Amino acid sequence: KDEDLAWEVIEGDHEINELYLDLEKDCIDLLALQQPVAGDLRFIAASFKIITDLERIGDLATNLGDYTLDAEHDVFPDVDVQEIGVAVVEMVEDAMEAYAAEDVEACYAIADRDDAVDAMCEDASEVVVRDLLERGDETTEAEVQQTMQDVYRLLLTIRDLERVGDHAVNIAARTLYMVENDDDLLY
């Protein structure tokens, strides 16, 4: 549990929101002042959507920071959320690199990796629920309440990590649309 990093992420959300608003304004100004067509219009439209995905990733990261600070102890050692976290961070980084390089093949690869992340999230959620069902040995109401809070927090963590992966796929899909005018990954 890295509380310093959690605080850094939470405190960085305001800056991300400010950047989002600045970039959104830039996109609107370009649309209004330049009246782009074809590839330029797709570039601005894709960028407009991508900055929304990045802002939402920032919001999810803030949630994850909050969950980290709220967690009192690791009650589910069989669930490796760090592995899922590493996978989705790599997906976001690769999606942004694909955008910058206009790399169509990387876009498809990112979408393919999302299936593995979804499977990891499903497996992790199943481990949590199975563990909860098998416990049944909490003797006090306080222990039951603490376990329920731990379960809820961990399931939210898993869900938010999975959503970060989905936003990485959205970025890849918008990039594919921008480069190839191909909406294959959008739907």
Role assignments for model-derived ranges:
Residues 1-187:
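Cytosolic, long alpha-helical scaffolding segments
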